[in-house]
């Protein structure tokens, strides 16, 4: 099926979700923006004149879009349809950019205060506190000495405080949808996220050790992730399938750090090569790590970033501007600091051993 036919189908589904039934719909033009294909749609609903919409962006040959499907039910201006469609894309990008900035600010504030925060997206406004307490005792030998207060549960573990709260409706600022965009390995992630009707917020306030607080947070989240009405797990700036999040947490059973529960690794390609970055290190008082313009493959860069994170959190290396580090004998790598290429913050950039 041609990509433009897929775009037309996506736009039709978008209309139907908004309870609008098109009586006419056609792709009339297309344009490229940021190396993505966009399709201009003209359509009519009952009683309307010709209206304009847009569907995109699609990578070349792809069948999934990046979420830019939109219309304001404005009249199509013949000869000016591309400018109208680009204005719709501008509006979408501005909307998501403003919400993403709020979500990121909340994350930074939590990091500065030593608060680990994650969410469980729920199919219904309910959860089982008794089941959580049993799971914590059986799996992690954590005894919860507290009672449920309404829909909230608070308890202490050593010098750390755990707070669990149930909220009706979807997460504020479209945070779940924003985080869903970073999970390219789960094709249905956005559909799942859009379905959630309630959510649990899990917060752990750090004591003397942020590492221990992070581990405790993962233990609580992993136990909750397997409750029947959990659709997805929102943590480390991305969305996890519940079973995968729980599987990653099992690393702690042999004393390992639950790296993939707590740190998200992002990758992107440009004409200069493959780049990657971390998201979540700031929770431990560290700058995020970035590696730019490599000639390697994603799997190799992922392994390299993982090694760096383990080494930083275990205290084996210190990433400071101007330092040289050695991960392998006889091979020194330069470290620098500067504004991120992918994140709106200062990161440490580490030379890649191409």
Cite the ranges covered by each PLM segment.
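Aromatic/basic-lined ligand-recognition segments
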Residues: 20-28, 33-41, 51, 236-354
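Intrinsically disordered, low-complexity regulatory segments enriched in Ser/Thr/Pro
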Residues: 46-83, 167-203, 273-293
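Structural alpha-beta junctions
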Residues: 61-62, 138-146, 220-234, 313-319
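Internal, hydrophobic cores of structured domains that mediate oligomerization or house catalytic pockets
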Residues: 88-113, 160-262
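N-terminal low-complexity, intrinsically disordered segments
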Residues: 122-190
């Amino acid at each position: 099926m041609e990509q433009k036919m897929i775009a037309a189908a996506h736009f039709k589904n978008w209309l139907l979700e908004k309870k609008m039934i098109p009586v006419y719909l056609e792709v009339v033009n297309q344009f490229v923006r940021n190396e993505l294909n966009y399709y201009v749609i003209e359509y009519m609903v009952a009683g309307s004149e010709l209206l304009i919409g847009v569907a995109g962006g699609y990578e070349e040959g792809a069948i999934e879009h990046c979420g830019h499907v939109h219309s304001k039910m404005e009249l199509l201006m013949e000869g000016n349809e591309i400018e109208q469609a680009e204005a719709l894309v501008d509006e979408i990008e501005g909307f998501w950019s403003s919400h993403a900035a709020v979500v990121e600010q909340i994350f930074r504030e939590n990091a500065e205060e030593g608060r680990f925060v994650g969410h469980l997206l729920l199919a219904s406004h309910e959860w089982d506190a008794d089941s959580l307490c049993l799971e914590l005792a059986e799996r992690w030998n954590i005894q919860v000495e507290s009672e449920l207060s309404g829909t909230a549960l608070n308890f202490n573990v050593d010098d750390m405080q755990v707070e669990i709260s149930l909220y009706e409706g979807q997460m504020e600022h479209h945070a779940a949808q924003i985080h869903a965009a970073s999970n390219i390995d789960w094709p249905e992630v956005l559909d799942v996220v859009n379905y959630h009707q309630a959510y649990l917020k899990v917060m752990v306030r750090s004591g003397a050790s942020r590492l221990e607080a992070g581990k405790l947070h993962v233990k609580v989240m992993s136990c909750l992730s397997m409750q029947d009405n959990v659709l997805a797990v929102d943590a480390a700036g991305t969305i996890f399938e519940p079973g995968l999040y729980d599987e990653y947490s099992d690393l702690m059973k042999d004393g390992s750090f639950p790296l993939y529960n707590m740190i998200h690794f992002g990758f992107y390609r440009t004409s200069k090569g493959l780049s990657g970055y971390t998201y979540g290190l700031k929770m431990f008082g560290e700058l995020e790590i970035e590696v730019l313009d490599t000639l390697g493959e994603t799997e190799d860069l992922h392994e390299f970033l993982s090694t760096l994170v383990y080494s930083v959190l275990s205290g084996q290396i210190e990433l400071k501007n101007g330092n040289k580090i050695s991960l392998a004998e006889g091979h020194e790598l330069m470290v620098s600091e500067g504004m991120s290429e992918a994140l709106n913050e200062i990161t440490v950039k580490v030379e890649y051993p191409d």
